Amino acid sequence: MKPSSSRASFAQRHWQHDGWLATLLRPLSALTAWHVARRRAQYQTGRRPVYRAPVPVMVIGNIYVGGTGKTPVVIATVQALRERGWTPGVISRGYGARIGPQPRVGQGRELTPASHGDEPALIAHATGAPVAVHPRRALAAQALLSQYPQVDVIVSDDGLQHLAIARDIEIAVQDDRGIGNGRLLPAGPLREPAARLDTVDAIITNRAPQSSATPTAASGQGPRRADMRLEPEAARHLQSGARRPLADFADARAFPAVAAAAGIGNPERYFATLRAAGLHPEPCLALPDHYDYRRSPFEAIVADAILVTSKDAIKCRGLDDPRLWEVPVQARLSDPGLFDWLEARLRQAAAAIAR
């Protein structure tokens, strides 16, 4: 495990409990709370400008730092909107790429992690939707609509805290960790106070494969709630494109030794997904989020197959390693009416914008 990955694991463990480290860092969390409240007030009072796009905007983000499963929700949402007749476009910060002063806009497989960032490239490859990236999401939205005027709804990948762009729908994605110890950074894992969840339109909880939690029921009060499980699909060979059922990798006759690697916000969730599918990868290599694959981390691994996430796969294509297989995941929601409900909200927003 890389040092930065070890530090992240250390922080995650402490963020689940209100122990000595949280107590020690509490004064710094008070500064975070002051900064968050001050910044929000500046936007609410008009001291900072807010861009209003001419189409509805849906933000999918979180208040828990790190990976909670936002990207699969973005992909599922874009696909669901397209099925319902919308032409969605996506905006993102473009983390992992050097964007420069001007937004970068592209569509489909022309996007690469180096040019547009890891998650934007993955979303573009999975959906074919146009994607614009820039740290200032208002600029990204303007560039997106300029180059793709047919876009009639913008989905923001992350950006719940990016208040410089007006939004019509907010979806918060969390996982079984919930709000951790409930404290703001650095004493806890939260970017904003836990009460922020009361103001969003919907909360999707990404459940672990073996979670025994009772499915969240949709409620008529407060945010609409749904559970999500990420179900693995057939593995795809990175070099040939061939597909094989995931069960094949549990067959010692086909693959005597299977390893796994993940450079995502929560690698253990990916490994747990593989184990829940009946696989027993060894070793499980937890890499830092947004890992740079220009140098292979797999040379010391003795295995017949190495299973990686889709986010890692798009960065591993330049590696000459025939052992690499991508394991895509599909988001399955407990609320079958969620996307119809979201579409109804979007139509209301579009009508209000047109007036």
From Swiss-Prot:
Q: Where is this region: Disordered?
A: 206-226
Which is an annotated GO molecular function term of this record? Answer: ATP binding
Q: EC number(s)?
A: 2.7.1.130
Disulfide pairings? none
One Gene Ontology term of the biological-process aspect is:
lipid A biosynthetic process
Q: In which pathway does it act?
A: Glycolipid biosynthesis; lipid IV(A) biosynthesis; lipid IV(A) from (3R)-3-hydroxytetradecanoyl-[acyl-carrier-protein] and UDP-N-acetyl-alpha-D-glucosamine: step 6/6
* TM stretches of this protein: none
Q: Which UniProt keywords apply?
A: ATP-binding, Kinase, Lipid A biosynthesis, Lipid biosynthesis, Lipid metabolism, Nucleotide-binding, Transferase
The record's section on HAMAP family has: LpxK
What role does it play? Transfers the gamma-phosphate of ATP to the 4'-position of a tetraacyldisaccharide 1-phosphate intermediate (termed DS-1-P) to form tetraacyldisaccharide 1,4'-bis-phosphate (lipid IVA).
Name by which UniProt lists this protein? Tetraacyldisaccharide 4'-kinase
- What is the originating organism of this protein? Bordetella petrii (strain ATCC BAA-461 / DSM 12804 / CCUG 43448)
> What lineage, starting at the top, does this entry show?
Bacteria, Pseudomonadati, Pseudomonadota, Betaproteobacteria, Burkholderiales
